[in-house]
Amino acid sequence: MFISFEGCEGTGKTTHSRYLFEKLSKKYSCVLTKEPGGGLFNEVIRNILLHSSNKQIDFHTEALLFAADRAEHLSKLIIPALQQNKIVICDRYLDSTIAYQVYARGLSQDFVLNINNFALNYIPNITFYLDLDPKIGIQRVKQFRPKEINSFDLQKLSFHKKVRKGYLDLCQKDQQKRIFLIDASKPLENIYNIIEQKLKEVFQIEL
């Protein structure tokens, strides 16, 4: 099973993916990973993409680096784990690329999907999209991880609003009902319960 967490900055993706991993690991064989990142080579790409100096990078170069990270991530970690019947929990995946590179950066969706074509056969079984007003999300980032501000955190509020619109459009167009929207302004415990209930309801996973 493949589970992904999506959302703008400061929505709690990392917190909730880690919590779910800790819960599921008590009963199932699980892998917790992230994008960009997830391996030694991937961390090199992650450092390039998230460094504060990345604000000036060409948008096509940025998209290609994300695609390279995903190709390595899939071949070295995600696919092998799925083949071993492990549950893969990923903090960001392909939906992030659409929201950030297409909606916020303004790149052609055809271009972005073409360079990520290899990933289209490995779509998550369920995606938890944590929705939050971007202004609140950025405030959370500054409050809870002030020493870990990255290049995307430094973007203007208008950029983050475009990212959110991208995610909401993906939710609306999701004919497979793969993406499950959660109000990320709710208390953490409430969100945990919503995630657990959804997994029990759809996949009969007991936590």
Curated annotation (Swiss-Prot):
Enzyme Commission code(s) on record: 2.7.4.9
GO biological process per UniProt: dTDP biosynthetic process; dTTP biosynthetic process; dUDP biosynthetic process
GO cellular component terms attached to this protein's record: cytosol
Keyword Transferase appears in the UniProt entry: yes
Enzyme class: transferase
Keyword field: ATP-binding, Kinase, Nucleotide biosynthesis, Nucleotide-binding, Transferase
GO molecular-function term, one example from the UniProt record: ATP binding
Residue pairs linked by disulfide bridges in the UniProt entry: none
Catalysed transformations (reactions): dTMP + ATP = dTDP + ADP
Sites where the protein binds ATP: G7, C8, E9, G10, T11, G12, K13, T14
Function of the molecule: Phosphorylation of dTMP to form dTDP in both de novo and salvage pathways of dTTP synthesis.
Family assignment from sequence similarity: Belongs to the thymidylate kinase family.
Name of the molecule in the record: Thymidylate kinase
